[in-house]
Regions:
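Cyclic nucleotide-binding regulatory module and flanking cytosolic helices
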Residues: 1-37, 88-90, 121
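Glycine- and acidic-residue-biased ligand/ion/polar-headgroup-sensing regions
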Residues: 38, 49-64, 80-81
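Short, Lys/Arg-enriched, Trp-marked, Pro/Gly-tolerant hinge/linker segments that flank
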Residues: 140-152
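Phosphate-/nucleic-acid-contacting segments
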Residues: 150-155, 160-223
Length: 223
């Protein structure tokens, strides 16, 4: 039996210190939005008024290289239960990144106004907010560390292992261009890295289907 929106929110760090009564009100204020692949939820620079929780599918959080070109760097991949778009609630700033569906997806759109109303009457909610922000900082620290200490081949190995979700055989859930954005390199350099894994016998590839043959060696290359 699928979880209710209220139950889904309760499992998220942001709402870890939120009372059941407040969760019920926040969930009731949410609106379900259905998205097709490529649909943009919001763009970088827009004025925000809501946060989102992924109900199904995958959402990419990315920053662009405009006006120089159309390349993007994917900062995060949001999946079922993940919350994003909360920063504007805390600092009233514009969106710092864009959010786009990578496949047919649905999200729960939660107005900031509903969350702010509960924060005023239940300030202990801030403990959950702090917990989520701390986890965000840890992720950004890891991304920064990867960019400094791992080359493109190492970052490609790491992203493939993450996208495999622990399975040796998997279908890549993103395009080659999107994978390049996650790695922070050109598509050509990422393809060369993948080709090197295949040549070494660590990986097999058929279109978007992959089979990891030497997970330990891939893991060592990504650390």
């Amino acid at each position: 039996m699928p979880m209710t929106h209220e139950e889904l929110l309760a499992k998220n760090a942001f709402f870890a210190a939120t009372s059941p009564a407040s969760l019920k009100k926040i969930a009731a204020a949410g609106i379900v939005r259905s998205l097709q692949r490529g649909d943009v939820l919001f763009n970088e620079g827009e004025v925000p008024d809501a946060m989102f929780v992924v109900l199904s599918g995958r959402i990419a959080i990315a920053i662009g290289n405009r006006p120089l070109d159309s390349r993007e760097s994917m900062l995060a991949l949001m999946e079922g239960g993940d919350l994003f778009g909360e920063l504007g609630l805390l600092d009233d700033g514009a969106r710092s990144a864009l959010a786009r569906a990578l496949e047919p997806s649905s999200v729960l759109q939660i107005p900031y106004s509903a969350v702010k109303a509960e924060l005023q009457s239940n300030p202990t909610m801030l403990w959950g907010v702090t917990k989520l922000l701390a986890s965000r900082l840890r992720v950004m620290d890891e991304v920064l560390s990867d960019s400094v200490f791992l080359d493109v081949t190492g970052r490609t190995a790491k992203r493939l292992l993450e996208l495999s979700d622990g399975n040796d055989e998997f279908v890549l859930p993103v395009t080659q261009e999107e994978l390049a954005g996650m790695v922070g390199a050109s598509r050509e350099r990422v393809n060369k890295a993948i080709a090197s894994f295949i040549r070494l016998g660590w990986l097999e590839q058929s279109d978007r289907r992959y089979r990891i043959k030497e997970r330990s060696k891939m893991s060592a290359r990504s650390s």
